[in-house]
Each structure stands twice: as C-alpha cells, then as structure tokens.
Amino acid sequence: MKSIKRIGLCISLLILSIFVTSCDGDNKITGDSKETQIKKSFSKTLDMYPIKNLEDLYDKEGYRDGEFKKGDKGMWTIYTDFAKGNKSDELDDEGMVLNLDRNTRTAKGYYFVKKFYEKDKLPDRKNYKVEMKNNKIILLDKVEDPNLKKRIENFKFFGQYANFKDLENYNNGDVSINWNVPSYDVEYKMSNKDENVKQLRSRYNIPTEKAPMLKMHIDGDLKGSSVGYKRLEIDFSKEGRDISVIDYLSYKPAKK
C-alpha cells in the first residue's frame, strides 16, 4: 500500500515509478553491457555532482533533441525528496522541486509536505512557493511553523552535495529491462561507509543502521531523450517501512 502511495507522489511530478516487468513476467538480464550503458547514461548528469552553486546550471546545456524549439536554451529541473513511513502505516514526505530556466536565468519552484494514510483517507499536501537568487532559496509564501520555515530556507538538494565520481566502480548490479517502455533499472548494495550515505544520515533522521540500496531507473532511450527521465533512489527501507531519498535532474524544453 505504501509503495502505491509513493508511486502516487512520483506521478504528480512526472516521476513515474514503473514496476519492471515484461509480458511474460520479470525480464532479468545478466552481463556488464547493459549495466555499463545504464551507468554511462547516468554519468552524463551525475558527473556534474556536486553542483554546489545551482546557478552554474544556467551555463550548462543538456541533451537536445527535436522537442526543442529553435532558440530555446532549455530548462533544468532538480528534485529531491525524503520519505519515511511510521508505525501507523502513514508516510511522511518532504522535498523540493526547482525549475531553472536558461532563457530567463530565473529559478522557481516549491517545497512540498505530504502525508499519506493507510486507510481510505485522502493525502494531506501543502506546497510552499520558492525562488532562487544568488544560489539562495527564498521562501515566497508565509509559513507559521519556524522549524518548517528553517528547513525550507536551508534546504539543499542531494545533487548539491552528492559525489558519484566512482560510479564506474559499482559493479555486479541487479539489472532489469522492460523492452515495451523501454525502461532500464539497476540496483547496487551500498555501504554505510559511502560518503553519499554518510551525507544523507547527517541531514535526515534515518532510524536504521541498515546499509541502503542504490536504485537507478531510466525511462526512455539510454542515449538520451527530453521525453524520458532518469531517477535515482537511495533506499533505506527495512521490514516494510519505507525510508528513501529520491533524486532527479532533467533537462527539457522551456518553451512549449
């Protein structure tokens, strides 16, 4: 049930969690070829991490295809959320999405707070508008809760402190492909000694010592596409309790 709720959030942000199956069931493959291709596809954005100053994205161009209109410099969208289930089978989820328009060199988005319930109760959701100037998040809406206000104004995206320079050293991952979409997934067991894991533990309340899984998902052409997307998840979930961080960086047309 909680997985369905988690998918619901991703759908609202066009980040669709796809259960990777083929017509006959799971289509698992082995071998390094596809695994290497998936990592190389991810490295096009992960090699940019850490992006300490998000305004650097104004001067970076991503993959362009026929979806871009002439003269459109494109828009980067960066997203991070942290979701944690509790003993009441509820799921609390907080995060931020920011759109950086390279044409206008402006960045606008929102911070969201969501709670999903196990029973037939609609989720609670609140969005708080933000913008970014001089690499600083500026809260545009009034927030009464001082702790929430502080979390919003001090928010850092995973891509601002993550480092995947050693991505090529991740090997023997569990690879899955759905040729019908197409979509590609690979999972790796991480170590608690990993600097990215240490960073997340220092920033979020993660009530488990369980080493997480690194899950990389690509929807669309491995070579690149402004229609598809890539999603990275670090999953600390344990004994049916959802605990995970989702990261997303995409480059798409800014002009419709």
From Swiss-Prot:
Residues covalently joined to lipid (S-diacylglycerol cysteine): 23
Coiled coil segments of this chain: none
Query: What keywords are assigned to this protein?
Result: Cell membrane, Lipoprotein, Membrane, Palmitate, Signal
Record's signal peptide:
1-22
Q: Which domain of life does the UniProt lineage start with?
A: Bacteria
| Subcellular location, record wording | Cell membrane
Q: Which GO terms describe its cellular component?
A: plasma membrane
Gene3D superfamilies from the xrefs? 2.50.20.40
- Lipid-carrying residues in chain (N-palmitoyl cysteine): 23
Describe its membrane topology.
Answer: Lipid-anchor
Recorded family membership:
Belongs to the staphylococcal tandem lipoprotein family.
User: NCBIfam families recorded for this chain?
Assistant: SA_tandem_lipo
**Protein name (database record):** Uncharacterized lipoprotein SAUSA300_0414
Q: What organism does the UniProt record list as the source?
A: Staphylococcus aureus (strain USA300)
